[in-house]
UniProtKB/Swiss-Prot annotation:
Keywords: Ribonucleoprotein, Ribosomal protein
Gene: rpmG3
GO molecular function annotations of the record: structural constituent of ribosome
InterPro entries per the UniProt record, alphabetical: Ribosomal_bL33, Ribosomal_bL33_CS, Ribosomal_bL33_sf, Ribosomal_zn-bd
Family: Belongs to the bacterial ribosomal protein bL33 family.
GO CC terms: cytoplasm; ribonucleoprotein complex; ribosome
Keyword Repeat: no
Name assigned to this protein: Large ribosomal subunit protein bL33C
Upper classification of the organism: Bacteria, Bacillati, Bacillota, Bacilli, Bacillales
Length: 47
């Protein structure tokens, strides 16, 4: 497993590094807390 960064879709801030299995082809999408937006927002895997 390697760690991939997650970016907030609202503000673009890179908030989390989460482990991801390398055999998954799709990009990771999680609803996480963003301290900059002060809300739970969708976070997508960045490159």
């Amino acid at each position: 497993m390697k760690k991939v960064p997650l970016n907030c879709e609202v503000c673009g801030n890179r908030n989390y590094n989460v482990p991801k299995q390398s055999n998954l082809a799709s990009r990771l999408e999680l609803k996480k807390y963003c301290p900059r937006c002060n809300a739970h927002t969708l976070h997508k895997e960045s490159k």
